[in-house]
Amino acid sequence: MAWRQAQPSRRQPAIFPSRTTLGRAVELLSHALFPGRIGAFAGDAAAEDRFVAERLDAAFTLLDEAIRAEFAYWQDVSAIDFAPERPAEILRLFAGTLSRVRALIDTDVAAIFRGDPAARSVDEILICYPGAVAILHHRLAHELDALGVPIVARIVSEIANERTGIDIHPGATIGPGFFIDHGTGVVIGETAVIGARVRLYQHVTLGARTPLADAAPGPRDRFARHPIVEDDVVIYAGSTILGRVTIGAGAVIGGNVWLLE
């Protein structure tokens, strides 16, 4: 009760973006990005174009609903007014990122296939591998976060966390060819920067050394507090790297390492 009493009163009940709605939106986007694999489409090119267009249209309808819910929330807690056309503009910009997102995911899947002799096909990777599921969600969430809908983006990332046990903040910047092997327990913080062709094993943490001091809820300054991992780094299972430290290109970090500097 003390916490509740300390908060500013709300003008109306909070309505947040729906987890179910966003889960379905990501599913539809996955079908559109990989129609012949995740979408299970079979047909000629013209039919495939229609399939993709229908999935994108349905996904954008759901995303529009979620974005409007987030804007209503922020407008209530901060009294910020948003232009009515802003959700449509965000969706337009997000749509423009999808070809780049698809290309990045292709590099991630290729890295997994090269790095795991147990992988029999890229189809198996896209459908079964938790690292592939997590990075697909992250690539989409990262674009949404950059476009100014952090709650929508965070829900997308948490859907992946629930499914895979891999926790990647949508603010984290991750280069091409990213491979999380096994994946359970991996944590990547908001301001982490990861280069190209990086491989992480299970239970790796790229975290911050200290939490924010107790402060009133609301907008906070976002400062760089998570590691920088340069190109071609391998970090083995159970290692914890905290703070704004830099892991140089080509480094190999052994298992169960605790690294602060």
Task: Please name every model-derived segment.
Residues N161-E261:
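Structural signal for interior beta-strand "rungs" in well-ordered beta-sheet cores
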